[in-house]
Amino acid sequence: MADSAGVRTLKGELRNWISKARAAEPDKDGKSRAILERVLALPAFRDARAVQFYLDTGSEVRTRSFIPRALELGKKVVVPYCTRDERGEEVLGLFALEDLDELEPGAFRILEPKAALRERPAKQWDVRDVDLILVPGVVFDRRGGRIGHGWAYYDKLLRLARPDCWLVGLAYECQVVDEVPMGPQDVYMDLVVTEQNVYEGLRLATRRR
């Protein structure tokens, strides 16, 4: 079921407003380091065997410099790339990353695994085998609501994650609002981590019942 026209309008307005605020946010590198240090300290991260990182672009929270640290900690690091499923729909594939040298610019100039490596069976990964997913977004709220870029890549992927997989949104504090309009296909986060706070989302509250 698609979002209603009202929800789409509200999402678009919030996306435009917060995109500008995020682009203007000072010291993104320093705040990104603070955010990722919080993530590394989470029990959920420490317990996870396979962690999905996104490969940051533009003004997103920077993640790339923490991938080598995750590998050093013994994590299986998985990264997404744009592909098509058997029906021809655009989806995110997952790749088991061992070194940043395995990446190259891809769709939207976002880094992704080199095409020559993706078909290797040992490099292909199923989202159901991921224990924690770091999720990008444009807008989040304190309940774990999320607005992405509007392409629905992550919405499709997150709906396939295991119920016990941790969904962790990464954002600067300026990206967090009181309430995000959520449609029927949208997925709440377990946690939203900023440079100032760790917010517990509705998905985590539901799992605890």
What are these regions (language model features)?
Residues 1-9, 13, 20-24, 116-120, ...:
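Surface-exposed, charge/polar-rich loops and edge strands
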Residues 2-129:
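N-terminal active-site beta-alpha-beta segment that forms phosphate/nucleotide-binding
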Residues 38, 146-147:
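Short linear sequence motifs
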Residues 58-60, 139-140, 175:
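Short, solvent-exposed loop/turn segments at secondary-structure junctions
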Residues 62, 153-154:
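Short phosphate-engaging motifs
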Residues 150:
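Short polar/charged helix/loop
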